[in-house]
Amino acid sequence: FFQDRFEGMELIYSLEEKTLFTGGAVKMALSRCRDENVFIVNGDTFFDVDLAAMAQRHQATGAVLTVATKEMEHFSRYGTVQFDDSGRIIAFREKQPCQHGAINGGIYLLKRNALDAISQEKFSFEQDYMEAQVDSVPFFAFPSSGYFIDIGIPEDYAKAQEDFQTR
């Protein structure tokens, strides 16, 4: 841990006493945040995204949720994010073989109060919030061409170790 500060930023930790799933954990962490918009980052991916530009887009669109997306070719281990010409997300598709598409890169910018209406303590951020609300809440994509790697499997973890030595 970085204690309570890192490079001038105040750090506040949110520790789960019991399993809350992704949505419950995010909701609990949001309750400790003070800013109106909060970045959420998956712990098992690395995605080089311009966070300042993502924040500007989030504000400009009036999004409740902005999702960093990455265009990929020939994949099956990720679901896809479909969005219209304005960047408004219109659908999240489950994992299936895909020739070309945008994936959820695991970086989000979310309004702090976005999950307040969810009464469940344990829920999935992706399924019970994102997929359930995509038709009624303004979610926007933030496409990025930055380096992306998911280290959730041993082969990609090893690849990340090699890649970071040369970066």
Model-derived features: positions:
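Conserved N-terminal catalytic core of the sugar/cofactor nucleotidyltransferase
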Residues: 1-42, 51-53, 83, 117
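Short, well-ordered turn and helix-capping elements at secondary-structure junctions
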Residues: 2, 15-17, 69-70, 93-96
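Residue-level detector of anion-binding/catalytic polar loops
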Residues: 12, 64, 138
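Short loop/edge segments at beta-strand edges and connector loops
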Residues: 15, 42, 67-69, 143
